[in-house]
Amino acid sequence: NVRRNRLSDFRNVRQNGLIAMKLENGERLIDVQAVREDEDVLLATRKGRAIRFAVADELRVFSGRTSTGVRGIRLGAGDEVISLSVLHHVEALAEERVAYLKAAGAKRRNGEPEESVDDAESVAEITLSPERFAALEAAEEFVLTVTAGGYGKRTSAFEYRVTGRGGQGITGVALTRKNGGAAVASFPVRDGDALMLVTDAGRTIRIPVDDIRIAGRATQGVTLFRIEDDEHVTSVFPVVED
């Protein structure tokens, strides 16, 4: 579940804190983010699902702090939300997004086609003007996804189409035995920054974001951290460079 409140609801915080959201049995709070009307929410799950919806259209402002909120994503059996991220909302038709992803992928690969472009959508093919391509390129964000087996990738946020909240979402990462079978992190990253990955064996590695491959949603990613068979990545966080 998700909910939105005014910051003023937390103006006077008592010494023992305030209730931010009512939780049902077995639930826990995943994250708290400040959002604006011109932004989107991205939820990702352990089983590799993701859903993106607009703050302005899908999240009303609650007047109190003690309700359970509204459904953000419908979880499958044994699944759970692992992250909440905030993305810039970009007005773009489905045909424009698909055309941009194909053109941007070909540009990165020196003319070779993009390996995966929003396979859940069937849209008419169009050609973007140079001006429109440049505008979308300037607005593009990338979402990092990392799995328990130390695999990861960057995916254009344009591959995460905006829908209504409460659905089952779309594939954010293809999970396999090879990549650990579970997603452990999913959030936006910027060029020039770095990542820290930590395992349950206490090992860490730092990786430049620029070195992480850009790939489609329905791919398993590539090796970021070579770990032992009984070892798992448990924590991933960005290191923002000045």
Q: How should these model regions be labeled?
A:
Residues 1-242:
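C-terminal interaction appendages of subunits in large macromolecular complexes
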